[in-house]
Amino acid sequence: MFYPDPFDVIIIGGGHAGTEAAMAAARMGQQTLLLTHNIDTLGQMSCNPAIGGIGKGHLVKEVDALGGLMAKAIDLAGIQFRILNASKGPAVRATRAQADRVLYRQAVRTALENQPNLMIFQQAVEDLIVENDRVVGAVTQMGLKFRAKAVVLTVGTFLDGKIHIGLDNYSGGRAGDPPSIPLSRRLRELPLRVGRLKTGTPPRIDARTIDFSVLAQQHGDNPMPVFSFMGNASQHPQQVPCYITHTNEKTHDVIRSNLDRSPMYAGVIEGVGPRYCPSIEDKVMRFADRNQHQIFLEPEGLTSNEIYPNGISTSLPFDVQMQIVRSMQGMENAKIVRPGYAIEYDFFDPRDLKPTLESKFIQGLFFAGQINGTTGYEEAAAQGLLAGLNAARLSADKEGWAPARSQAYLGVLVDDLCTLGTKEPYRMFTSRAEYRLMLREDNADLRLTEIGRELGLVDDERWARFNEKLENIERERQRLKSTWVTPSAEAAAEVNAHLTAPLSREASGEDLLRRPEMTYEKLTTLTPFAPALTDEQAAEQVEIQVKYEGYIARQQDEIEKQLRNENTLLPATLDYRQVSGLSNEVIAKLNDHKPASIGQASRISGVTPAAISILLVWLKKQGMLRRSA
């Protein structure tokens, strides 16, 4: 039977991608249905109890700037906040927070259940309704059919998921949850390229069996960072430390002597694992010269005794896991409460997607999260928001939207996936972005909130706060530009006391702030330039904008040159065999990838600058050279 009411957008899956997709579509006013196999696991942290990190924190800030959920949820659930790379430049500084799993899940569910235009329904999906190469709905396991104009697949590791512990394996979407086998089979019938990937998780330890007295503590930062541009530190719950231990030669001997029982090394697992989050088996074998590896013991929550040992993801048998755990300092009597495991699952080649994350072959079908070959909550959330907003726009007969590489880490993520694809779980790093200085955590709202408002993602409260911040920045910069001190002025002595070289000519507040030894905080304690802004976010922007003004202007020039290529569109139906002068290799790669623009084509491995020139000349001769607005 059909459900009596149609929907504009259906989201399948309630993880980090699905929840952001559902919230985005509903915020834009579209009638949205979130289908999940279990309402109680909405927003579940399946692996590590943390949000953020290098590159990842940037994505969280961008999701927040577009009105998303993740940053708000972690501000309510974070039990330790830190700024990584704090001693480095602002481009690579990143926020990271340990999470209380229960509080995080509660924050997500509360937001979902109070979001207008959003209905949540508990049923696993087993089929899609596809008519004339267009998706028009979904079918649940009890045969209930839902109609919609767009469907977003955010199914994580559930598609034909297989869990491995030692040489034993069984079907599962994650520990304790069933896999989605019928939906996997249905998707394999569609004209989509499919592969297998693998990820893993460490055993969880009973905190009562660890001797923390012999371990180093790691505390959070004070003052505490905040993730959301709308948040404040008073929202954070109680803060707790993490602890540090290490593997040792005994640990490594245990691992080496049991590799024949590892499903990875025994050839049982086909899927490729994450390069940047390797199992402890991989670490020991790949870095054979290392006699120890640092392991962070992270609390899973304020009311839980479970500890997440970050750094020993493993699929070795349980008895070997026990030996590994008990070989480390402080863990000699430790007890495992959940075994570690590896999970294999289906993913679909993201090169078959448009930059909006809509399928090139099935109209109205969007993909987001691990199904696209990524790993990580943050990467999933960012894709979910993009897929959700574009599903909403499609259902409202509007053009899709996707950020450029120069606009957001989300743009880098989507361009990498859709242009290059991936053969291993993709993780975001700041090193993947060419324009890091422009794509900082601190300016995510300045880059994206206005766009979010135009798209219908940003509410009135956020918009008012954003405009107030803009006004504070502009007013303060004007004040510093127009406030001067001369070498002969009475205030010069006070200023000179904070400079490595005394004033030799008249200087404005901005001139002084450009000096390496001067900070905004210090400058605004000096009589001519006091008082400081009370808006800390605006104050941070003033300092960064002034100090890096020249570098930012130079990078902006580079971006404008590159945009000419990004905006030169390539016909979706173009057969590159028609273009005389291209090598067979280039023709094959262009026909395989079907890039949307000259910019995308130039990033495909093997497509040379000479080939791009030939292509541009050919397009011009054919009268097909056109640029997007």
UniProtKB/Swiss-Prot annotation:
Q: Which SUPFAM superfamilies match?
A: FAD/NAD(P)-binding domain
Kindly list the positions annotated as binding NAD(+). Answer: 273-287
Of the GO CC terms on this record, one is: cytosol
- Listed binding positions for FAD are 13-18, 125, 180, 370
State whether keyword Flavoprotein applies. Answer: yes
Xref: PROSITE patterns: GIDA_1 (PS01280), GIDA_2 (PS01281)
Output the Gene Ontology terms for molecular function: flavin adenine dinucleotide binding
Disulphide bridges: none
Question: InterPro entries under this entry?
Answer: FAD/NAD-bd_sf, GIDA_C_N, MnmG, MnmG-rel, MnmG-rel_CS, MnmG_C, MnmG_C_subdom, MnmG_C_subdom_sf
Which GO biological process annotations does it have?
Answer: tRNA methylation; tRNA wobble uridine modification
Family to which this protein belongs: Belongs to the MnmG family.
Q: Which PANTHER family match?
A: GLUCOSE INHIBITED DIVISION PROTEIN A, PROTEIN MTO1 HOMOLOG, MITOCHONDRIAL
Q: How does it assemble?
A: Homodimer. Heterotetramer of two MnmE and two MnmG subunits.
**Descriptive protein name:** tRNA uridine 5-carboxymethylaminomethyl modification enzyme MnmG
Native source organism of the sequence: Escherichia coli (strain SMS-3-5 / SECEC)
Which gene is annotated as encoding this protein in its UniProt record?
A: mnmG
